[in-house]
Amino acid sequence: MAQSHSSSVNYFGSVNKVVFEGKASTNPLAFKYYNPQEVIGGKTMKEHLRFSIAYWHTFTADGTDVFGAATMQRPWDHYKGMDLARARVEAAFEMFEKLDAPFFAFHDRDIAPEGSTLKETNQNLDIIVGMIKDYMRDSNVKLLWNTANMFTNPRFVHGAATSCNADVFAYAAAQVKKGLETAKELGAENYVFWGGREGYETLLNTDLKFELDNLARFMHMAVDYAKEIEYTGQFLIEPKPKEPTTHQYDTDAATTIAFLKQYGLDNHFKLNLEANHATLAGHTFEHELRMARVHGLLGSVDANQGHPLLGWDTDEFPTDLYSTTLAMYEILQNGGLGSGGLNFDAKVRRSSFEPDDLVYAHIAGMDAFARGLKVAHKLIEDRVFEDVIQHRYRSFTEGIGLEITEGRANFHTLEQYALNNKTIKNESGRQERLKAILNQYILEV
């Protein structure tokens, strides 16, 4: 039986509380760049970054892949069933405390096992939610978001809200209903929808419009129920182009924004964007962040990175300073993430199987984003790119360009202007110069 909250559980015995020691430190269990109380642009690093630990990769993943068995050595995994669920809560909050992580996130099936019926499943969930609530009461950690796992169980083989089976649609609705109740009880600042099975494998047996309509109906029902129970957290939808489905409906930021606007959901949802999902969609992470930002729909981030040589969702910990800098540049330009945060939807490699590797990995990710924050803030403060962009588009601030932006031009006037204009002169975009400046800031700030 897992020990009670009051007992001295110590799953990470070799790890003390991780503190900031600075870049000269050689201690692998210390922050080199993440100084939670350092003030940058009027806010502390902790306030800017709002780090969150993902329950699924950190406490439930066992290292199984399609070619091999589990490798992870977890001191809580000798328990079974509900005892295992309780032990994971103990391990989670020990790690949250040692990393001083302000937030965490989970799927419903991460924290409690399914029972033989929906009623039994909900009872299991209630027990663990009660335990988590007790631990949260005695700590400073908050729930960034929770969500429903509607992709693992075989009942979701054809999807959840987009299933061809109305019984499955009803089950999914019941599961999200419970998820929203859990969000309210635990004070989740957001609720996430990720439709891993919401898509299709072939159009030969798919009514695409009907499935999209049903998905929208489902989302509206969720909005209505949140209002009914007075849950006020931000709804987030997470794009991904494929895996496990061949074609997922919320392919990328642009596709998801179009869906939200088409079905009148854009006032209720923002986007939870993941770096590895961006690369799977053929985009850079900063592209997805910019696309959401300019539409006013950037809500939260799943912080990770994909392997450039692999074509699937590798969910590596984010250590690429180039990427973290450009991500934080977009987040700062957005005025922050509001109720969102940087959730480490990342897993240690299968060969990094010892418990301490979980801590090393989170330190690496937190330091990488802390460094990215400082560089991005300095880039914005110095107007490195803003001045270049302003100069590049200056032709639209006067003359015919100003007439275009003010709506005073039409095809007739533009044709006349083009006929009279004898010369068109373009200027270099100077991409290489800008990349060199970016490298200089990353190395020197």
Curated annotation (Swiss-Prot):
Its main location: cytoplasm. GO terms for biological process: D-xylose metabolic process. InterPro entries: Xyl_isomerase-like_sf, Xylose_isom_bac, Xylose_isomerase. Its EC number is 5.3.1.5. Disulfide bonds: none annotated. It catalyses: alpha-D-xylose = alpha-D-xylulofuranose. GO terms for cellular component: cytoplasm. The active site is at H107, D110. SUPFAM superfamilies: Xylose isomerase-like. PROSITE patterns: XYLOSE_ISOMERASE. GO terms for molecular function: magnesium ion binding; xylose isomerase activity. It is found in: Cytoplasm. Binds 2 magnesium ions per subunit. The keyword Transport does not apply. Mg(2+) 2 binds at E274, H277, D313, D315. Mg(2+) 1 binds at E238, E274, D302, D345. Its cofactor is Mg(2+). The keyword Isomerase applies. Keywords: Carbohydrate metabolism, Cytoplasm, Isomerase, Magnesium, Metal-binding, Xylose metabolism. HAMAP family: Xylose_isom_A. Homotetramer. Belongs to the xylose isomerase family. This is Xylose isomerase.
